[in-house]
């Protein structure tokens, strides 16, 4: 399978061995699309990741192979968060899942900028969701960044007459503007 790997100041396409479950609990999914997150750009630009790293975590995928005690089946189109909160640390208990002390212990393997990734059974049980048929791959690719916007709005405890200001019209700014409009 092909992956887009960091190689110094470049990203190269590299052919690697196809992923297999080999008895592991989880799923091999075919990536239909992957968003380019600002964190991917920062990691690459500032050399935070090592050569060979495959970035990307905002995936839309189809399950190709599965070994899991969940309701997911081969052929299901899904989205999944890349990290799994522990739900037990102080941050998780206060609803700050993205600050989880164990957050970075889990990830999609090798990364969304590849033809396929492995999602653990923990991903499937906790942070993966089926995509309704009427939602396109392009629309659902905003699942993760839109979730960040909605979480921020919910934390602000806004009421319909409150005024807000969105600074910046990158993808997050545009999503935030649309989410604020939709919420009144």
Enumerate the predicted regions with their spans.
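Conserved beta-strand elements of the Class I
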Residues: 4, 28-29, 165
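Glycine-rich beta-strand-centered segment in the early N-terminal region that forms part
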Residues: 19-34, 47-90, 123, 130-134
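Cytochrome P450 core scaffold surrounding the K-helix E-X-X-R motif
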Residues: 39-43
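NAD(P)H dinucleotide-binding glycine-rich loop of Rossmann-like/cofactor-binding domains
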Residues: 88-167
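Hydrophobic/small residue at the entry helix of a nucleotide-binding pocket
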Residues: 148, 172, 180
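Conserved S-adenosyl-L-methionine
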Residues: 182-184
